[in-house]
């Protein structure tokens, strides 16, 4: 798989870009703040419908514009597929697939399968559980695009159930039988969609685990062994059954957990049970990595998660596109060599770097330079050969 064309309109610092790409390696070189990362961010957005840098779409639209457009043409086994995404300010985003409008932007998921390595990856080890949940959900969706609808359904039910809990919080409405009956309905919906999402995550973690272990051994052969596991809000007592990923069991366990925590949820006005409170646990030896891993160990573990994702996607179908955003500058020589070895085998690798010295020695790659130019509409990014 490779991206043949990338087009941008009013995306971040890019007022306009039309870039023809090829299989193999392409390096975008430019000073920090010149817009090179925005190119990879646009491709990652086309792959996942999300940014790796911000949680909302508004910052993706260039200042003064009311929408941004990201267009890609992806080639997979000789077949071309065009995706156009319109990111709008204050209204729903739109998408086209092979120039035809689609009802939901989610319909383009799976066209571009990519793996992104970025400085922000350190948050996979050191950050909040939400970072690790997003890693799992993005990867699960790339492999099975239908998971996106499950995530959307779960998030919608979670918002509505939380709003009801807030309206019932404290002692004011405890006797409102109608409201409590409505809460029972939301419990059932939350358990239904939550079980589907948890089952997908658990299946993914079980497949990732041996790949993470192998990748970490490659990156840090003298370190402790790395391992991962799924930690559920259902509690340690249920962990063995939970890790089997049986959907019926998970749905029943979620319903039981919601019932057991109902008084606490009503008191606090928030949902205390469900996959939105779960975590991907990362271990080095017998210690949880977060809070105990050194800087080098944390980087190795973060890279291992991305390398494991690459291997799973490659085993599914065809090589995913590798996006390497300024990561070589963050790595020591051993980790550079390990990542470069993976990149050697990928069909397409797109890399950003501040200076040429950040690129592995001996790499044969097309080089494009990113510059900033002052215009009447502000500073915009441009490419030159």
Curated annotation (Swiss-Prot):
It is found in: Cytoplasm. PROSITE patterns: RECF_1, RECF_2. GO terms for cellular component: cytoplasm. ATP binds at residues 30-37. One of its GO terms (molecular function) is single-stranded DNA binding. Keywords: ATP-binding, Cytoplasm, DNA damage, DNA repair, DNA replication, DNA-binding, Nucleotide-binding, SOS response. InterPro entries: DNA-binding_RecF, DNA-binding_RecF_CS, P-loop_NTPase, RecF/RecN/SMC_N, RecF_2. Its main location: cytoplasm. One of its GO terms (biological process) is double-strand break repair. The RecF protein is involved in DNA metabolism; it is required for DNA replication and normal SOS inducibility. RecF binds preferentially to single-stranded, linear DNA. It also seems to bind ATP. Belongs to the RecF family. This is DNA replication and repair protein RecF.
């Amino acid at each position: 798989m490779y991206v043949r064309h990338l087009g941008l309109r009013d995306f971040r610092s890019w007022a306009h870009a039309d870039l023809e790409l090829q299989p193999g390696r392409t390096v975008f070189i430019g000073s920090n703040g010149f817009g090179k990362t925005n190119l990879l961010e646009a491709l990652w957005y086309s792959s996942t419908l999300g940014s790796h840098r911000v949680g909302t779409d508004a910052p993706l639209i260039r200042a003064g514009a009311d929408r941004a457009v990201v267009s890609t043409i992806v080639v997979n086994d000789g077949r071309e597929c065009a995706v156009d995404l319109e990111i709008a300010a204050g209204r729903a985003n739109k998408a086209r697939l092979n120039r035809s409008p689609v009802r939901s932007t989610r319909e383009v998921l799976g066209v571009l399968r990519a793996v992104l390595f970025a400085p922000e990856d350190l948050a996979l080890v050191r950050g909040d559980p939400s970072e690790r949940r997003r890693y799992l959900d993005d990867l699960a969706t790339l492999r099975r695009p239908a998971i996106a609808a499950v995530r959307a359904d779960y998030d919608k039910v979670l918002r509505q159930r939380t709003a009801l809990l807030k309206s019932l919080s404290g002692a004011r409405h405890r006797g409102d039988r109608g409201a409590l009956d409505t809460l029972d309905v939301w419990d059932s919906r939350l358990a239904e969609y939550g079980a589907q999402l948890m089952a997908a995550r658990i299946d993914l973690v079980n497949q990732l685990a041996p790949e993470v272990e192998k990748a970490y051994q490659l990156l840090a052969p003298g370190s402790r062994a790395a391992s991962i596991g799924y930690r559920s809000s259902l509690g340690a007592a249920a962990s063995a059954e939970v890790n089997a990923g049986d959907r019926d069991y998970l749905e029943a366990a979620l319903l039981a957990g919601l019932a057991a925590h109902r008084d606490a949820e009503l008191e606090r006005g928030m949902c205390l049970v469900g996959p939105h409170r779960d975590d991907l646990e990362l271990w080095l030896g017998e210690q949880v990595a977060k809070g105990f891993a050194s800087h080098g160990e944390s980087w190795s573990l973060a890279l291992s998660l991305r390398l494991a994702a690459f291997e799973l996607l490659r085993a599914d179908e065809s090589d995913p596109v590798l996006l390497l955003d300024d990561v070589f500058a963050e790595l020591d020589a051993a980790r550079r060599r390990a990542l470069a070895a993976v990149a050697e085998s990928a069909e397409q690798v797109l890399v950003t770097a501040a200076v040429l010295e950040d690129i592995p020695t001996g790499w044969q790659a097309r080089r494009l330079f990113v510059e900033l130019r002052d215009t009447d509409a502000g500073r915009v990014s441009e490419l030159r050969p």
